[in-house]
A protein has these predicted regions:
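Conserved, mostly hydrophobic/aromatic
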Residues: 3, 28, 51, 89, ...
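Metal- or metallocofactor-binding catalytic centers and their adjacent structured scaffolds
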Residues: 24-100
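Ligand-binding pocket scaffold of soluble enzyme catalytic domains
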Residues: 21, 27-32, 62, 100, ...
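Structured beta-strand/loop patches that form or line metal/cofactor-binding pockets in enzymes
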Residues: 1-32, 36, 320-326
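Glycine-rich, aromatic-flanked loop segments that form ligand/cofactor-binding clefts
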Residues: 90-126, 130
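Proline-centered loop/turn at the N-terminus of a beta-strand
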Residues: 104, 118, 183, 235, ...
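Shared catalytic-loop signature of beta/alpha-barrel
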Residues: 51-53, 65, 203, 209-212, ...
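Metal-dependent enolase-superfamily TIM-barrel catalytic cores that perform enediolate-based chemistry
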Residues: 116-231
Length: 327
């Protein structure tokens, strides 16, 4: 079996861009992948087409070999655009391989470690009561965990003391709304640059027993995050903006996090995520993949989560209506 073409489909259905990748073979099999939207999405599409020239005529089942061709073909270590493009192609290759063998992809990854995957939903709202109402809705939908930004939306334009008070009120309102049997994760979305301030937000939220504290600082600042990790007393989660085993090796070595959150549409693909998970397992860390993109990403994450022993929980985007639901 040989690769005969690789196509891209850039679509926008109202929630942002989606870049789908289609790998076509000479045996009437094709695979579908998706590349993460990193911002310059047209450039990601062009990167896929650039990589295609190296893959035409190759055996699509040699995924490790083809990954090395794509990654090593860059003179310098790749950034978000290259790794998003590689991820989209790599995921499509797994789709081809699963179809060729007539088995679900998770069977090619070692088989099932579990029968169910725990998920959480993001919640939000302008006021503490809005957050509480959305949290109650999530619980009524069957979720046993939710994630929220503890800080108010206008946190950059109000006094810091007020940010801390409002953060405590928001998390308290959600805890009171859902009770003690629902986990609450916190995600300031890497908006805090100063270690001391991130620690202060964590301290005012700690009484409400957060499941984890995500992107507590800028994700490239492993040293600052490691310093925070030593003091915080809440599990730190990060990794959505990082890619490849090489960056995650440095993250793990810095002892900056307890929970790793690679995005399979960005980190290098499914096999790269499995390698990251194996390193994490050896260091007694757990995995909670970043998954905000939609149904394709959720399907891919399903194969990863069901076959990964140190999986913790999966982000899940619930679309009850609109274009994404129809998709």
């Amino acid at each position: 079996m040989k690769i005969t073409d690789i196509l891209t489909y850039g679509v926008n259905i109202g929630d942002g861009n989606h870049i789908f990748v289609k790998v076509i073979t000479d045996e009437h099999l094709y695979g579908i992948g998706e590349a993460y939207r990193v911002g310059p999405d047209l450039a990601v599409e062009q990167t896929v087409h650039y990589l295609k020239e190296w893959l035409i005529g190759e055996d699509p089942t040699r995924i490790e070999h083809l990954w090395r061709i794509m990654y090593n073909g860059s003179r310098f270590p790749g950034g978000s655009m290259l790794n998003a493009a590689i991820s989209g192609i790599e995921l499509a290759l797994w789709d081809v391989k699963g179809k060729a063998h007539g088995v679900p992809v998770y069977q090619l990854l070692g088989g099932r470690c579990r029968d169910r995957i725990r998920v959480y939903r993001g919640i939000g709202g302008g006021t503490p009561q809005d957050c509480a109402n959305d949290a109650k809705l999530a619980v009524s939908q069957g979720f046993t965990a939710v994630k929220m930004n503890p800080m108010p939306g206008d946190n950059a334009s109000i006094p810091w003391g007020r940010v801390l008070r409002e953060s405590a009120k928001r998390v308290e309102a959600v805890r009171m709304a859902v009770g003690d049997e629902v986990d609450i994760a916190l995600d300031p979305h890497a908006e805090i640059f100063e270690t001391v301030r991130s620690l202060e937000v964590a301290e005012v939220c700690k009484p409400y027993r957060p499941l984890f504290y995500e992107e507590a600082l800028r994700p490239e600042n492993f040293q600052a995050m490691a310093s925070l990790h030593e003091k915080i007393g809440i599990p730190i989660a990060t990794g959505e903006m990082n890619y490849t085993k090489y960056e995650f090796r440095n993250l793990i070595a810095s002892r900056a996090a307890d929970i790793l959150q690679p995005d399979l549409l960005l980190c290098g693909g499914l096999m790269e995520a499995k390698k990251i998970a194996a390193m994490a397992e050896a260091h007694c860390l757990t995995m909670a993949p970043h998954n905000p993109m939609g149904p394709y990403s959720t399907a891919v994450c399903g194969h990863f989560c069901i076959s990964t022993p140190n999986f913790l929980i999966l982000e899940y985007r619930l679309d009850l209506d609109g274009p994404m639901r129809n998709l």
